[in-house]
UniProtKB/Swiss-Prot annotation:
GO terms for molecular function: ATPase activator activity. GO terms for cellular component: mitochondrial inner membrane; PAM complex, Tim23 associated import motor. The keyword Zinc-finger does not apply. It is found in: Mitochondrion inner membrane. Its main location: mitochondrion. Keywords: Chaperone, Membrane, Mitochondrion, Mitochondrion inner membrane, Protein transport, Stress response, Translocation, Transport. This is Mitochondrial DnaJ homolog 2. Present with 573 molecules/cell in log phase SD medium. Residues 85-146 form the J domain. Plays a role in mitochondrial biogenesis and protein folding. Participates in the translocation of transit peptide-containing proteins from the inner membrane into the mitochondrial matrix in an ATP-dependent manner, probably by stimulating activity of mtHSP70 (SSC1). It comes from the Eukaryota. The keyword Chaperone applies. GO terms for biological process: protein import into mitochondrial matrix. It comes from Saccharomyces cerevisiae (strain ATCC 204508 / S288c) (Baker's yeast).
Amino acid sequence: MVLPIIIGLGVTMVALSVKSGLNAWTVYKTLSPLTIAKLNNIRIENPTAGYRDALKFKSSLIDEELKNRLNQYQGGFAPRMTEPEALLILDISAREINHLDEKLLKKKHRKAMVRNHPDRGGSPYMAAKINEAKEVLERSVLLRKR
């Protein structure tokens, strides 16, 4: 009686693993090696001329604004967090800056923490940076007080 339940759970786990693996592979295969290196903050001293264009995203799965923001970002964190860096960490777009209030900031902070919380496999360092980004924007003149 317990055996069919165990088998069912095993099959379900395998199916979900395969599905997430295929989704990850779909995104991964659209990125060039230099783009992957750039996203992982790996510096390549002298990329060959044929690969210079590979630093730009070729994926249609990522919207244009995010492509531009990631292509301009040099990687790493500044010693003291700046407002542009905080906006990038919390994924606040240029359109949302005009409407940035406490409610939107809380929503973006929560979304980032859900994705990167240490209890769910995220990095404690990134969680600290997300909290720091929220604090920077709370003190910022960009935040509209109601």
